[in-house]
Amino acid sequence: MITTTEYGDVLRFDLARTIAGRGRYWTTAYFVDGIMVDTGCAHTSGELESALMERSLDRIINTHSHEDHIGGNGPVQRQRPGLEILAHPLALPVLKNPAKMQPLQPYRKFFWGWPEPCEANPISDGAVIETNQYTFRAIYTPGHSEDHLCLYEPQEGWLFTGDLFVGGKDRALRKDYNIWQIITSLKSIKGLHLRKLFPGCASVREEPQQSLEDKIAYLEDLGGRVLELHKRGWKVSAIARELLGGPMWVEIVTLGHFSRRQLVLSYLQMKSDDVDDPYPDKSGG
């Protein structure tokens, strides 16, 4: 399933696998002046190819290497031989061989699918990408992944944030994210001159500074409360229940890979093997 929305010269694609007539676990990509920022998941690659058929596409820029952002790379590049794909240097091994370098849990295979390999070139922090009308700058923003980039157009005040910025108040985190790096990266972009924020997993923000300030304040406050309870001897499971509420559907679907527990562990800079209360809904604390 694919829907499009125009924001001036920026065309937004919302993409999701269709299950029982509905799109599930959406991701977002953008087209602007010959550049595609991310390409969605493998399950929607055919629809994306069709949507791009009449458009002049010069290059793809991936904000990071997760499967729901690179899934259209291979098919689109195959359709347009020689099409340049750019990504952070740490992302290139994944793009070249996704099956080997980024094994997927069952839920990720089901909702987004295995990406095809593609050929890509490196783009590092501070690199400039010029199009006919715009000049973009890559900004390294790790945390959601080690290879995460944002794309900034200073004259327009546009910032394409990939999955660095997500909407709402986070109650769960994936096991391989780093929450403190996410906060640091959010702070690094907050000082930019911004008019519009184009996220990979949220609605477009027309008041980006306020959105970023609110997100940072929430995450820092939550982190402070996690650390305080841990200092007082609370177990991870009890902290998760106290601060993040009851069980979430996503915890069941992902078998705990994306959970309240993982968010608490990330704040504590601990791994699952470091604690002895593996069940987030058992008592403790």
Task: Tell what function each PLM region has.
Residues M1-R55, C150-G162:
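Conserved beta-strand hairpin/beta-sheet module of binuclear metal-dependent hydrolase folds
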Residues Q79, W180-V236, E242, G246:
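Divalent-metal (often Zn2+) His-rich catalytic cores of metallo-beta-lactamase-fold enzymes
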Residues V37-G40, D58-H66, I85-P89, Y140-G143, ...:
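Active-site neighborhood of phospho(di)ester-bond hydrolases with catalytic His/Asp-centered motifs
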Residues P115-K175, F258, V264-L268, V275-G284:
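Mobile, glycine- and charge-enriched loop segments
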Residues T44, S65-G71, L92-L95, E146-H148, ...:
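Active-site environment of divalent metal-dependent phosphoester hydrolases
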Residues T4-Y7, A91-Y140, S145, P154-Q155, ...:
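Metallo-beta-lactamase
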Residues G46-I129, A217:
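Active-site HxH/HxHxD metal-binding segment of metal-dependent hydrolases
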Residues L229-G285:
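C-terminal regulatory/interaction regions
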